[in-house]
């Protein structure tokens, strides 16, 4: 497994960023979607990607989760190069996907079980957990996102906000090291948004890491997130443009 050194930690020891992209390029159907993007996310950070539609935010999320592979450049997770060879190792790929929890902007893209309870239990059930630990994780995640009363409901019959909360519960039940969230509050009412915000603040306070995309600077301010702005030319800066507004989002 390839690895790369990172920044100095306590006592001068080398500590790799949890997420690092180095000059990553990705094209789709002859169109360059991500053009030489470099960024880092350290452990315990809450980082927001901002930028206009089409700048590549969603594609960057998919690259980080291993759903896409860069044409050129390097992606490192916890110091290890994530590429086709890495993901062909089924054991390594399974550990990687357990550590990187991804929630799509459209929750329908990741809901596939007959009931909410089965949906939330599916991920941790693949981890070989003892039955009592599996039950505890499912119960806690459903309570956390206030979907416990929907345990026997079909995910397909829920509102958009309920689906989003079920998708979050399903990923969080796996206790990933980092949550990668594509527009996590899109389509949520105020109460559901509060649930998500309070969870994210507590998650990071517990030492976990969050990388999210959003169009809403008010959400970034509320979370105290470090902002990375990607402009329409795919240039990356460490703060959103003062002229950048809060346009409603679409995937890019």
Tell me the role of every PLM-derived stretch.
Residues 179-182:
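Catalytic Walker B motif of ABC-type/P-loop ATPase nucleotide-binding domains
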Residues 154-158, 162:
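Conserved ABC ATPase signature
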Residues 73-85, 96:
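Conserved ABC transporter NBD signature motif
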Residues 214-215:
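H-loop/switch region of ABC-family ATPase nucleotide-binding domains
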Residues 132-150:
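Conserved ABC ATPase "signature" region
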Residues 65:
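Helix-to-loop junction immediately C-terminal to a conserved catalytic motif
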Residues 50-52:
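The feature captures the beta-strand-to-loop junction immediately N-terminal to the Walker
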């Amino acid at each position: 497994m390839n690895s790369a050194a990172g920044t100095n930690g306590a006592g001068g020891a080398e500590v790799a960023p949890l997420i690092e992209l180095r000059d990553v390029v990705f094209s789709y159907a002859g169109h360059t979607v991500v053009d030489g993007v470099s960024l880092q996310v350290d452990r315990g950070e809450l980082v927001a990607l901002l930028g206009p539609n089409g700048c590549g935010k969603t594609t960057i999320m998919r690259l980080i989760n291993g759903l896409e592979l860069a044409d050129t450049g390097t992606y490192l997770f916890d110091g290890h190069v994530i590429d086709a060879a890495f993901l062909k190792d089924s054991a390594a790929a399974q550990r990687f996907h357990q550590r990187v929890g991804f929630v799509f902007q459209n929750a329908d893209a990741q809901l596939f079980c007959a009931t909410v309870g089965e949906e939330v239990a599916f991920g941790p059930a693949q981890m070989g957990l003892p039955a009592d630990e599996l039950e505890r994780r499912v119960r806690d995640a459903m309570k956390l996102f206030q979907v416990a009363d929907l345990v026997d409901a079909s995910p397909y019959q829920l509102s958009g906000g309920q689906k989003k909360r079920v998708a979050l519960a399903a990923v969080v039940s796996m206790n990933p090291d980092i949550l990668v969230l594509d527009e996590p509050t899109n389509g949520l009412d105020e109460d559901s948004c509060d649930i998500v915000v309070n969870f994210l603040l507590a998650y990071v306070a517990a030492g976990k890491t969050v990388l999210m995309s959003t169009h809403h600077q008010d959400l970034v301010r509320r979370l105290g997130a470090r902002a990375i702005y990607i402009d329409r030319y795919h240039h990356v800066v460490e703060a959103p443009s003062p002229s950048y507004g809060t346009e409603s989002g679409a995937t890019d």
